[in-house]
């Protein structure tokens, strides 16, 4: 894992290409991999997705023509300016003999930025996914370990990033609701800066290393944990008021700030729903050269990356 400074990537746009490319090179060097093919992801804000219904039995070429025709209705750009892809989900539940097809499109400049990052690090981008789709892929494997293989369970997945927390509510691999909220781990860093007078860089380093004054737990961390739990509870209330559902069976926390001491307990207390950290490596064999304690400690941060890596086994 290699941290990026604030402002290097904003709303999915790579603002400091050279700096981000150098960070990618450092990450590749650290992990020691000889693999050159990589899977990458765009944030949902950079991708337009739409589920459409098309006649069943079409060839791949016929599907492509139909998708391009339908896409013009939903994409506010010329098709020459976007990278477009689609996949057949399965038979349509609403129209006998037809199939549901998911189309996804992103501006070519955003796609080329990701490809350029890979090339700058000596890598070859073979898959470009959407972050939320990759997260769900990794989470779905874990949902299947729940009682009754997770069938009909309503699972709320929260990914707590630096500036944004993403919520997805999933049932039987279907997304019932999704929402982004503007809060994240960077707010904790800002609290540390204000409380102790550190620079933002010092605060981030000390936060990650646990090298903070004795009153940090009670004076800074605990209020932030309680505030985060309240935000998560508020997000659930939005779900309940926006859909016919009134319960969540399980809440999973992922992301860089998910493992903060006391957060899962605070969420359970705020919401009355069971909450736990997600470990995308659960049930996997860990290689001998991997520092397992460190991996387990940071595991919630790797949910999206794990989902991207799993694409290798789903081709």
Residues covered by each model-derived region:
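Hydrophobic/aromatic-enriched cytosolic interaction surfaces used to assemble or bind macromolecules
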Residues: 1-315
